[in-house]
Amino acid sequence: MPIAGSKEERKFAPVILAGGSGTRFWPRSRKARAKQVLALDGERTMIQQTVERLAPLADSAQIWVITNDLLDNLIAEQLPEVPRDHILREPAARNTAPACALAGFLLEATQPETVIGIFPADHVVKNQVRFVEIVRAGIALAASGDRIVVLGVPPTRAETGYGYIELGAEVAVANGEIAPRRVKRFTEKPNAALAEQFVASGNYVWNAGIFLWSARTLANAIREHQPKMALLMERIAEAHRTSQAEFERVFAEVYPQCENISVDYAVLEPRSVKGEAKSEIYCLPGDFDWNDLGCWSALHEHAAGCPPENVSVANVFEGQDPLCISIDSTGNYVHAPGKVIALVGVNNLVVVQTEDALLITTRERSQDVGAVVAKLKSAGREDLI
């Protein structure tokens, strides 16, 4: 199976999903300034890092961004190199399946063979060179037939917050090429016991949420598994071919009618039921030091390199003002600009302060910070979310 290819040989359109609200990164992440437009681990924002990561694979004119009406102007400011009409704002949040379908149907009309890459806006990748190698191989594989390519990250722990991919047979390739595996099935966020079994088996990888498929393959997969959504997308795509004004009118009217469903549940899981020999779903190894930065604990691990370290962002540990003093304390994450923070005899805490809010939790419970946002919403405190 040929999977070699290059940027010049293959038409490639990266689609960056940037519509999430990032509630688990409250209080820094808010509706109008969600985590994908924040510089959480450096000077560049998450979405800027994503575009830079894709630069060796596609020109900026080929990139699309799907976001919401609270973030689209800010994203346009942060990404001046991306065409403004390629930054689409969803009229309603509908999860990843409608967003992927939108890209597929819009591009199918004029570029059916173009490979679409779906990339979340809020991931971090330390090994950029390996990332480009893997994605380039995936582009070529997706372009060589009616194939869906997913990237699977080798698990380092029994994580219950990720989806898992069960790997099937290895596909024979020429010497030096990256060998894909067929996919047996997808399992979304297993319980702790099942996650332990998956990792122990050595035959499962984390689902990185990065997918590659031609525009035609993507659109046809939606037609097969989500026929109602497909009809809605046909109307949107037809309007897009008419005029910008007509597109915006129909998009606003029709898109909210789509089911709120992830692409995993909508397409990948039902397609995998066909069996690995017929589903034409392939997995390439995402061995490029990946982190989805799903919560404050994940950011601590990404920044620290090893969990026992204290990590301070916007504070400096015992070096200069503002500073963070640590006495008999390890594994803590601190973000409190302009404040002196003292940690005495505490371990594995997350301390995050903004102008109007203070969060204190444990790293273990940082996955649950989104519940704070839910409580604020029910209390009518929209000013804090």
Stretches found by the model and what they are:
Residues 1-11, 215-385:
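Left-handed beta-helix
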Residues 2-16, 23-34, 39-136, 153, ...:
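Conserved N-terminal catalytic core of the sugar/cofactor nucleotidyltransferase
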Residues 10-12, 60-61, 83-84, 111-114, ...:
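Short coil/turn connectors at secondary-structure junctions
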Residues 17, 67, 120-121, 214, ...:
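A secondary-structure boundary/capping signal
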Residues 42, 52, 56-59, 80, ...:
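Generic secondary-structure signature for well-ordered alpha-helical cores
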Residues 47, 103, 122, 165, ...:
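Residue-level signal for inorganic ion chemistry
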Residues 128-253, 280, 363:
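Conserved core of the sugar-phosphate nucleotidyltransferase
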